[in-house]
């Protein structure tokens, strides 16, 4: 089997898949990523590409992302031509096409089976955009998003099959394309994610927090409204007043992964710290953490708060569940798919800081009900194992079409 894996930030979601495939006898696994892609330790099949130029600053605002996608597609196609000229012709191309890399893949490798990871299809209503009245969208936002969907529509038209991690993400795509889209999560390391009664972590200020301590955890790639950071901070202010011994470990960077940058502060962390009054001795911002330290955070957690707009589900929620954390999640569509209220965690209204604080305080107190939820969360997370993800993607590589609406076997 000859496979070409494409991701702007390779390996992205495909790391564990590439690692497994590259070890198989007779498999030739190559990859494409931007020159800024981190690569995969122990894997030397990555070919980097570089954009010919940046998008023009004078480009129409609605078209800037499309011009960027065209430049990515051009650069990736040139890299694919080099692979072809050196004798590599893939049987399958697996790609995250969200930046435009596969726009011209079929022009280079017309006989390859093109499989797209279709992570998201934007809509101006009914999901992330316009969800939070605190940040209303403009007509220009709506028009820009509609134009940007031209890329995602082309991607769905061009591919032979598509896959998405959750039923919620699949449901966001136009109905005409749903028969093409299967559901399969890539998988998390459930073998390496487990509770640890002896886990401990030392904060930057020197405080040592251990499993069993009243520790609230919050994790996001970046601290921003899409992941409910503003609401969490308001809830934390209430929590610290109610529970005088609780500590909060807040993991995430100060950049923006989704949505817009804050206008009246350097970043969302500074903006929210100016709004709420927190005890700095009990509030621990870690920034982004190495994997081992991140795991310790989940293992010392007495209550893990996960909030998100109706958007892509974070791996961190599933990883917290695999560690047996007590989950307090927003009652939004992607979270409902992973967490059952009263069984594997508690669902709370996204915007209700008072209710979030109340339920989190209950989780800190523990008890038999929360112990049962933690155990059930860990058991449920096994459904998202790396083994299940690999089996599903193996089937997708050779299937004539994905199974619709169910995890790919």
Residue ranges and their predicted role:
Residues 341-342, 346-353, 362-367:
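Conserved acidic donor-binding segment of nucleotide-sugar-dependent glycosyltransferases
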Residues 204-227, 233-238, 249:
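Conserved donor-binding/catalytic core segment of Leloir-type glycosyltransferases
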Residues 256, 261-288, 292:
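Nucleotide-activated donor-binding/catalytic signature segment of Leloir-type glycosyltransferases, i.e.
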Residues 53-63, 111-150, 191-200, 254-265:
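Acceptor-binding helix/loop patch of EC 2.4 sugar-transfer enzymes
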Residues 309:
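Aromatic "clamp/platform" in nucleotide-sugar-dependent glycosyltransferases that forms part
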Residues 369-383:
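A short, well-ordered alpha-helix in the C-terminal region of glycosyltransferases
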Residues 326-329, 339:
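Short hydrophobic beta-strand element within catalytic cores of glycosyltransferases
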Residues 1-44, 163-165, 408-409:
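N-terminal subdomain of nucleotide-sugar transferases
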């Amino acid at each position: 089997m000859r496979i070409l894996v494409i991701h702007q930030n390779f390996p992205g979601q495909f790391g564990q898949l590439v690692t497994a495939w590259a070890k198989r006898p007779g498999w030739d696994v190559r990859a494409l990523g931007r020159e800024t892609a981190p690569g995969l330790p122990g894997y030397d099949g990555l070919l980097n590409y570089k954009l010919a130029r940046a998008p023009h600053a004078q480009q129409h605002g609605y078209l800037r992302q499309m011009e960027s996608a065209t430049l990515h597609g051009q650069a990736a196609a040139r890299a694919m031509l080099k692979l072809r000229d050196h004798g590599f012709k893939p049987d399958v191309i697996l790609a995250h096409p969200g930046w435009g890399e596969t726009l011209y893949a079929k022009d280079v490798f017309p006989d390859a089976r093109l499989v797209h990871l279709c992570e998201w299809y934007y809509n101006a209503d009914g999901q992330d955009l316009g969800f939070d009245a605190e940040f209303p969208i403009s007509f220009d936002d709506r028009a820009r998003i509609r134009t940007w969907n031209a890329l995602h529509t082309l991607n769905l038209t061009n591919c032979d099959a598509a896959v998405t991690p959750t039923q919620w993400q699949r449901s966001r795509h136009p109905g005409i394309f749903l028969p093409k889209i299967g559901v399969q999560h890539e998988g998390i390391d459930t073998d390496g994610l487990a509770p640890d009664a002896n886990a401990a972590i030392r904060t930057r200020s020197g405080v040592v927090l251990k499993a069993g301590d009243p520790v609230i955890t919050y994790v996001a790639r970046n601290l921003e409204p899409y992941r409910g950071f503003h609401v969490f901070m308001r809830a934390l202010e209430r929590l610290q007043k109610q529970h005088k011994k609780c500590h909060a470990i807040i993991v995430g960077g100060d950049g923006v992964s989704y949505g817009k940058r804050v206008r009246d502060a350097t970043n969302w962390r500074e903006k929210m710290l100016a709004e709420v009054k927190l005890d700095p001795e009990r509030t621990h911002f870690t920034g982004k953490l190495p994997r081992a330290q991140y795991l310790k955070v989940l293992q010392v957690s007495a209550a893990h708060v996960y909030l998100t707009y109706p958007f892509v589900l974070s791996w961190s929620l599933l990883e917290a569940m695999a560690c047996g954390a007590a989950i307090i999640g927003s009652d939004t569509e992607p979270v409902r798919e992973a967490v059952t209220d009263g069984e594997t965690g508690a669902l709370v209204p996204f915007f209700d800081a008072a209710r979030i604080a109340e339920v989190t305080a209950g989780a800190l107190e523990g008890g038999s009900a929360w112990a049962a939820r933690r155990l059930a969360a860990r058991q449920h997370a096994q459904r998202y194992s790396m083994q299940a993800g690999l089996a599903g993607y193996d089937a997708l590589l050779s299937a004539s079409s994905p199974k619709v609406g169910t995890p790919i076997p």
